[in-house]
């Protein structure tokens, strides 16, 4: 019988919180009691000492020194002074021993209450999101797509004219693709919800409650030892007091930590309230296609998306596995440290280890959460991998209706498709972008005058920076900044004057801020007055403000942003639209998941560190970073046209070749600039370029980029995250990245552009692509591609890096081709 089996229900959580509050009140009462005992012992010892001093004033010397009374009294007064010292020592021992330990125990108990409440709430929120909200959203979308598919099917079957039938067929194919893809997402979501449900009720929640009970029992054991130590120190030798203390000692000895909560559990324990596990809702199939419930659909429409999903899930599983490994190492290390410290710690000092025990329990809980995430991804990977392995090297099965239509295709159409990507392949590569979602933006904000903005938004306010750092920031006489005093709740105006930094404390009285003379309702108004009037800060100093020293322009507060809706997802987290509160600038906000390990968060910030140094019209602009608290944000300009790959697939049919030449010229200009800065992008592709509303292309996604003085970067760690079909042979074989390897990727980007967003090597796996390229194979010329551009592609794909053109040459060549093209 324990917390994990008897208190899994929400009612159990409530009574646990009530119990924690009651125990904290009890501990506070004990602390006040002990503090009063220390105070009374000190006062009593002081009175005895004062009596001894009074007697030493000579009253006893009136009697002969040889008098027995005099000697007895002298001994009495001497022993009284000894008793005074003993009582004073007892009081100090009580204060530094039991009372200090009890205060530490109370702080740890308060922290445990807070940590438990936060972890319980987080587990419930994650369960509700995975098990209810996400599933309901997927089901709602499923029903809508099923209705659309059924309607498109009826229109297709009812169409009589060839033109109408072809148009209805296209719509039906698109609806089928979307339905099958969403069916797969729903299957994966149901599997993830099932695993999360199982882990929550069998591992996560019981583990949390088991950890809580272990810590409570450990605290009960520590409290027992504190009380025993208190009674030993405060015990006196009188028979009456000894009897009382024996009773109290017996009461303290009756404390049994392992049985402390048995009565509580008998009174409040209840059966676990486990809701039914989610299952595939077969009613979703009533209006749509005859799909198998709980089974992935793998056919010619979904094979690419299933392969991509498997790659994505495999990457996420690798990150999750790494997280499990790290947390297992952390738990093992903490357990070993705790064992070593227990061996070297006196039993009465166990309270000193309580903080580490809580850290260990939190690490164990974190390990269970990581194992749950790993299990969900493992289950999804197995579903996807089993389906693809069952397919084998053969072609994916056709959709029955499309197979019938394919038999009726005329021989002339087949000849027209010879040497080109099949119509179905083009359809699949274009269809993902046909219904590109349009995202909304947060509304404009009312702009606030600079002087009316709060203190933390002022450019000259630097927060709690060290005083030593101020001297480095103040360069010229009259330079100033405002900072928060370290260790004190007051603000300081620091100014460089006559070669020395001067620091003036800003006085605050009656909600007015001043140095000398007139007061102002805010510090920004005070600084504005001193700047505009050039009034000396104080008559004695004669210091005048001249120039504000701004803080690092890249540092933003989370409060500086107004987040809009999610517009995408990256390797590290979600991407949102947003605005800057200061001037309504539209921004894109990349977030970093809080659960990522520190090394991955450092890789996330690598993009910002690189972009800080660059300014070019064809490089996406960095606006700032938010690192003051979690989650970490990278704030960049919002390029509203979206990514280049989706743009090609949705708008490509109406684009002229000259426009495409202008856009790849933009890409070449941006890469020429990066080449001049010795920056290696390593992930150049259409998906990582952005398009403005005026069709200007910008290079983006610098998460894999590196800056090397010699222009060569040697990578290690395998190919898990390498985009194989875009990567040069020397980078795949030897991990050698350079501007020349970026040139190879640029050749693939050219091919993507003039094939209007088709996938390179569409019928080859990553390994087959590597073997094909090593044997001298290259992509064919796209239908829309000018011959001069294809020759440039072939130069970019030279096997030897030294034989590839530089980006400067590529840019000049594209400009020349564009001028010649009509």
Swiss-Prot record:
Changing residue 759 to F: Reduced autophosphorylation and strongly reduced kinase activity. Residues 460-549 form the SH2 domain. The modification Phosphothreonine is found at residue 421. It is found in: Cytoplasm, Cytosol; Cytoplasm, Cytoskeleton; Cell membrane; Cytoplasmic vesicle. Residues 1-300 are annotated as: Important for interaction with membranes containing phosphoinositides. Its EC number is 2.7.10.2. The modification Phosphoserine is found at residues 64, 67, 408, 411, 716. Residues 394-421 are annotated as: Disordered. The modification Phosphotyrosine is found at residues 261, 713. Tyrosine-protein kinase that acts downstream of cell surface receptors and plays a role in the regulation of the actin cytoskeleton, microtubule assembly, cell attachment and cell spreading. Plays a role in FCER1 (high affinity immunoglobulin epsilon receptor)-mediated signaling in mast cells. Acts down-stream of the activated FCER1 receptor and the mast/stem cell growth factor receptor KIT. Plays a role in the regulation of mast cell degranulation. Plays a role in the regulation of cell differentiation and promotes neurite outgrowth in response to NGF signaling. Belongs to the protein kinase superfamily. Tyr protein kinase family. Fes/fps subfamily. The coiled coil domains are important for regulating the kinase activity. They mediate homooligomerization and probably also interaction with other proteins. The N-terminal region including the first coiled coil domain mediates interaction with phosphoinositide-containing membranes. This is Tyrosine-protein kinase Fes/Fps. It comes from Homo sapiens.
């Amino acid at each position: 019988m324990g917390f994990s089996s008897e208190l899994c229900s929400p009612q159990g959580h409530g009574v646990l919180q009530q119990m924690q509050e009651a125990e904290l009140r009890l501990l506070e009462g004990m602390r006040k009691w002990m503090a009063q005992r220390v105070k009374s012992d000190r006062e009593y010892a002081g009175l005895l000492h004062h009596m001894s001093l009074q007697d030493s004033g000579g009253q006893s010397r009136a009697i002969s020194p040889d008098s027995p009374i005099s000697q007895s009294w002298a001994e009495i007064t001497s022993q009284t002074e000894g008793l005074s010292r003993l009582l004073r020592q007892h009081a100090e021992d009580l204060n530094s021993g039991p009372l200090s330990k009890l205060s530490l125990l109370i702080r740890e108990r308060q922290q445990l209450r807070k940590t438990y409440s936060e972890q319980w709430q987080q587990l419930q929120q994650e369960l509700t999101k995975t098990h209810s909200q996400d599933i309901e959203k997927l089901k709602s979308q499923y029903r809508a797509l099923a209705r659309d598919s059924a309607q498109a099917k009826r229109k297709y079957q009812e169409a009589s004219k060839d033109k109408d039938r072809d148009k209805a067929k296209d719509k039906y194919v698109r609806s089928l693709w979307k339905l099958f893809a969403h069916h797969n997402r729903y299957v994966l979501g149901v599997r993830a919800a099932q695993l999360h449900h199982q882990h929550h009720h069998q591992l996560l929640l019981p583990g949390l409650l088991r950890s809580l009970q272990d810590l409570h029992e450990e605290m009960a054991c520590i409290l027992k030892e504190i009380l025993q130590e208190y009674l030993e120190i405060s015990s006196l030798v009188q028979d009456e007091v000894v009897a009382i203390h024996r009773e109290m000692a017996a009461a303290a000895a009756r404390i049994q930590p392992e049985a402390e909560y048995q009565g509580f559990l008998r009174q409040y324990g209840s059966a676990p309230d486990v809701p039914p596990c989610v299952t595939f809702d077969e009613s979703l199939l009533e209006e749509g296609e005859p799909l198998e419930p709980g089974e992935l659909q793998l056919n010619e429409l979904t094979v690419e998306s299933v392969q991509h999903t498997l790659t994505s899930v495999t990457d996420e599983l690798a990150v999750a596995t790494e997280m499990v490994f790290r947390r297992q190492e952390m738990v093992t290390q903490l357990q070993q440290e705790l064992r070593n410290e227990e061996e070297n710690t006196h039993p009465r000092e166990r309270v000193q280890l309580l903080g580490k025990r809580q850290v260990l329990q939190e690490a164990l809980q974190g390990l269970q959460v990581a194992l749950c995430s790993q299990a969900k991804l493992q289950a999804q990977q197995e579903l996807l991998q089993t389906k693809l392995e069952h397919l084998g090297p053969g072609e994916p099965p056709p959709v029955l209706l499309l197979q019938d239509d394919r038999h009726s295709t005329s021989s002339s159409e087949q000849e027209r498709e010879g040497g080109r990507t099949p119509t179905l392949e083009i359809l699949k590569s274009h269809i993902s972008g046909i219904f590109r979602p349009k995202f909304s933006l947060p509304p404009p904000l009312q702009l606030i005058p600079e002087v009316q903005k709060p203190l933390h938004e002022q450019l000259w306010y630097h927060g709690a920076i060290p005083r030593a750092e101020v001297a480095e920031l103040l360069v010229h006489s009259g330079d100033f900044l405002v900072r928060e005093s370290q260790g004190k709740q007051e603000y300081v105006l620091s100014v460089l004057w006559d070669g020395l930094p001067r620091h003036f404390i800003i006085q605050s009285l009656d909600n007015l801020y001043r140095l000398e003379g007139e007061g102002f309702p805010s510090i920004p108004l005070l600084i504005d007055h001193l700047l505009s009037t050039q009034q000396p800060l104080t008559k004695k100093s004669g210091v005048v403000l001249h120039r504000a020293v701004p803080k690092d322009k890249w540092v933003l507060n989370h409060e500086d942003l107004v987040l809009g809706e999610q517009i995408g997802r990256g390797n590290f987290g979600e991407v949102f639209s947003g605005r800057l509160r200061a001037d309504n600038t539209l921004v894109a906000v990349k977030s970093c998941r809080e659960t990522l390990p520190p090394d991955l968060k450092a890789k996330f910030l690598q993009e910002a560190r690189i972009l800080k140094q660059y300014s070019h019209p064809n490089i996406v602009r960095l606006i700032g970073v938010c690192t003051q608290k979690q989650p970490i944000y990278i704030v960049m300009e919002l390029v509203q046209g979206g990514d280049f790959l989706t743009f090609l697939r949705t708008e490509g049919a109406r684009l002229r070749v000259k426009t495409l030449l202008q856009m790849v010229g933009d890409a070449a200009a941006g890469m020429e600039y990066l080449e001049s800065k010795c920056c290696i992008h390593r992930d150049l592709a259409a998906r990582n370029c952005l398009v403005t509303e005026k069709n200007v292309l910008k290079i983006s996604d610098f998460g894999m980029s590196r800056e090397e003085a010699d222009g060569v970067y040697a990578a290690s760690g395998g190919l898990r995250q390498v985009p194989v079909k875009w990567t040069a042979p020397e980078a795949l074989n030897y991990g050698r990245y350079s501007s020349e390897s970026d040139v190879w990727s640029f050749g693939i980007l050219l091919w993507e552009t003039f094939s209007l967003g088709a996938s390179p090597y569409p019928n080859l796996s990553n390994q087959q692509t590597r073997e094909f390229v090593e044997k001298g194979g290259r992509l064919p010329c796209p239908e829309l591609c000018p011959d001069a551009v294809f020759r440039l592609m072939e130069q970019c794909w030279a096997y030897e890096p030294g034989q590839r053109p530089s980006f400067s040459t590529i840019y000049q060549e594209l400009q020349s081709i564009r001028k010649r093209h009509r």
